[in-house]
Amino acid sequence: VGTISDGSGCFNINSLVIFKDGNFIENPKSIAAYSKLLELMEVDNNLINESADQIIDWIDRDTLQRANGLEDYYYTGPLHNPREYSGMRLLISIDELKSIPAVRGINWNIYEDNFCALPIASNISININTLDQNDTYLLASIFPNIDLNDAAYIIDNIPKDGFDNFDNFSRTFPELDFESPNGNIDYKSKVFNTKIDIYHEDFQSSSQSIIMYENNKNGFIVARIYNGI
């Protein structure tokens, strides 16, 4: 049994960083979008700041602690079980966030329902044409001047054939302010999730893959997870 779905309809947690000069450094736009999404979810502001800094410290390759961050001294110390080193790489799965102390203070359903871990360190990018009413928080997080009601209105009025460019999109909602976005709006899917389940008598196995589709019409697998093989 196989399924394929748009892989961009989520907040890529790895977008909190960009890669520059051999290190992962903060991405201010994505941090702003992350903060707004959690604010809309009524998460305490201290937890928002702590979780953002601690996630970035987990990913980056240096040992310099951010204002609200944590580095290896904490993860290898007696207060952390099991003792481990920070990842120093992009996250493979959002489940890795469970190692982050500040994240454990936030309702896990928020991450499970809205976030993903794509192996991409760049601004958030979502396909507006594949969003549904479960994605209002995601859409509102990208635009500083769009609230949840605005986001729901936009999604409810996506035309059957979709939008094909930003001018077409923005002209449809002239009363809304799309200035200074903290992410990118796409009009075609470039990232896909595939899941394959195999059943044979008492045997069961599955695989999940992330496939990226480039402008040259070539696709390639950027991540794959197996279970039961």
Predicted regions and their residues:
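Compositionally biased linear targeting/interaction segments
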Residues: V1-I229
